[in-house]
Amino acid sequence: MVEQEGLTAKEIDYAFQQNENLGSKETSFLIPEDLQSPPEKRFNLFLRRRLMFQRSEHSKDSVFFRDGIRQIDFVLSYVEDLKKDGELKAERRREFEQNLRKTGLDLETEDKLNSEDGKTYFVKIHAPWEVLVTYAEVLGIKMPIKLSDIPRPKYPPLSYMLGAVKLPSSVKYPTPEYFTAQFSRHRQELFLIEDEATFFPSSTRNRIVYYILSRCPFGVEEGKKKIGIERLLNSNTYLSAYPLHDGQYWKPSKTTRPNERYNLCKNWARFSYFYKEQPFHLIRNYFGEKIGIYFVFLGYYTEMLLFAALVGLACFIYGLLSMENNRTSTEICDPDIGGQMIMCPLCDEVCDYWRLNTTCLHSKFSHLFDNESTVFFALFMGIWVTLFLEFWKQRQARLEYEWDLVDFEEEQQQLQLRPEFEAMCKHKKMNPVTKEMEPHMPLCHRIPWYFVSGTTVTFGMALLLSSMVSILIYRLSVFATFASFMESEATLQSVKSFFTPQLATALSGSCLNCIVILILNFFYEKISAWITKMEIPRTHQEYESSLTLKMFLFQFVNYYSSCFYVAFFKGKFVGYPGSYTYMFNIWRSEECGPAGCLIELTTQLTIIMIGKQIFGNIHEAFQPLIFNWWRRRRARTHSEKLYSRWEQDHDLQVYGHRGLFYEYLETVIQFGFATLFVASFPLAPLFALMNNIMGIRVDAWKLTTQYRRPVAAKAHSIGVWQDILFGMAIVSVATNAFIVSFTSDIIPRLVYFYAYSTNSTEPLSGYVNNSLSVFLIADFPNHTVPMEKKDFVTCRYRDYRYPPDHEDKYSHNMQFWHVLAAKMTFIIVMEHVVFLFKFLLAWLIPDVPKDVVEKIKREKLMTIKIIHDFELNKLKENLDVEYGNIMKNVLVDEDNSLKAKTTV
């Protein structure tokens, strides 16, 4: 190219580029070329640059291409790699982007010079109408064909009392209800297409684009066709791939196009709206059904927790009101009863004898949770969990109808082969469905990986149990230290009634256990992902199911093992004075206090549950906030106006494919705390309720402000988590029955009340004395007797054994067997009663409500009728056209024949 006078070659190229991008109104200010002198040419170049700069500044926060018309549906980012494989990555990108263009997608690249860090390229992707309609048909996306004549569900009676909780109708139902049908290009006239630009929601658009990206090839390497954006992301060919948020979350859109992100932030992600219902339809429209159904489940679970929390709070208040009048605590606190009972030492040698009334306050606290209401609450929660799951099935069925998921088929991305599986496969096999050859891995090749996986899982479980044993050893070893220290320190005597050695050990052990749990969680997440990867699952769905099972098993053992120990093992295999059981022949087994072990289980459960919730909420809220602040601080060097929309989203945290996985896992673990051991802690549902109320808003705030927009995906249920919840519901019936029988003191009190009490006016009078056996101090072995000699002849301990003057001294007496029989009877009766109710309720409550069945039938009927009428009218039009053409041809032939006769 010959250089123009006064301009360099670069300036000429730049001028041509700008002329192509400027509009007619903008170029009207330019001096005509035939009148240009060198200074005027430079003025034109300056003006072009200034106009383009202003346009660039104006469009930096835009979600459109430079033309301001084509919407950005997806963004890819990358940096040039100067290493030896940089050329290979560049070639992959060229091939990939070329193939994307062949599918019909529009691409526009932002040069690295326009980015904040000066090294990142951004590829903006737009799906034109033809691409959208083609893949909408491929994916079977349902779109509206007619306004529905089925009325929306009405609020129940007395709903006006919940006016403050309800959202405005325009927010709750942002769009009308329609009859829908699977989209078809050949029936476009059937669908309610008012504007092609807004017909497909942004969530549907990014879902279609991601489907294309996940199946687009980028070359052939080592004789294998390489496919999909995920493989390119794994190899760092691209840094990221994400759909754009609608706009800024703190201000509405300046255009007529609604800013759904702002609407969500305003009506959902505000912490001041914690008492409001959630805008589920807005969530679904913006994030897709998969994320939407998670928030529906979390909201429903929180609503149901309200009933459990109220009943649990009532049981706690009952325990609080009856605490002072409790006969057992009264006898323990009485100086003439509990003050005269000398208890055997709680550890060997260093521990001294002690009086029963020193545990007065401890016994009162124990009564808060160990009272008659415990049995009622255990039965109630067994029925509550059944109602929760059965009504969730109905809620899920209603959701399937409202969100057009009735004929849902699993997402293609979930059923697509994983790149890692394809890379490891050397064999191929005919797919009986698609009739195509697919990569196949024989079972004999999988067995070694399954063995490695099974071994690792077993080792992980053993490590978890060993950590629990280590904490148990800590509790055993530190108990004697606490006991001797509190006994010897005169300054601690005043607090000894409040802070007993048992309580000190329980608190310190629970706090240590909570810390260990949180640390092990971090490692087991990595281990579970590594093990699952080693198994080489075939599809993404198989990968998620396998990972879910492993993570749940690890978390189950990690969080609940210590609670199972306190509930079912502590104090059950202690022995008796003179014949105690020892762990590793060193540490004496832990004993329960005179009021039982239930208060220790409550302490353990409270610390772990609340500690986990506090840590989880702080981590969820502050981690993305700090990370995003740091990334923005490093990246942004110009004013906010020049910080482009795609760069703003690029600097947000990645939600990832497993984002929902961790949310479900956290909810299921919390569900376990609220059901498995709820008989020991009736306030657990209340704490879970408070956590969820704020947790919903934290999750909403994260998704709308701190994370990149996730790719929309469909789901019609919560998947494998529903089976896990059903399993935990069944286990919870057994655990609560065992807690009431073996951990609480209710059954022994009832046995004494009905079978052994001799006081008709106060049947529980004398229960404390009856529950403590007598031991002759002279029978202590030398290595266990306290160093400090006392004048006592006997001491008491918690068990049902014969006294030292009996011929079967220290053997279990008949009352022990009566109590044991009563405990087993209670377990059998409670389990059968609860399971009977469970099966009866499951039978009475249909999985799909009757009105939903009728609505589904109505919609199917109307859809078939509308399509039938459309096809019939189309056929008539075609027949009319064909008939007209035939008649026209007949008339022409007749006219020609008449002309021929006239000529003859």
Curated annotation (Swiss-Prot):
Induction: Up-regulated during the course of myogenic differentiation. Down-regulated during osteoblastic differentiation. It is a multi-pass membrane protein. Highly expressed in skeletal muscle, bone tissues and thyroid gland. The chain crosses the membrane at residues 291-311, 372-392, 454-474, 503-523, 549-569, 668-688, 724-744, 826-846. GO terms for cellular component: endoplasmic reticulum membrane; plasma membrane; vesicle. GO terms for molecular function: intracellularly calcium-gated chloride channel activity; protein dimerization activity. Keywords: Cell membrane, Endoplasmic reticulum, Glycoprotein, Membrane, Transmembrane, Transmembrane helix. One of its GO terms (biological process) is plasma membrane repair. It comes from the Eukaryota. PANTHER family: ANOCTAMIN, ANOCTAMIN-5. Plays a role in plasma membrane repair in a process involving annexins. Does not exhibit calcium-activated chloride channel (CaCC) activity. Belongs to the anoctamin family. This is Anoctamin-5. It comes from Mus musculus. The gene is Ano5.
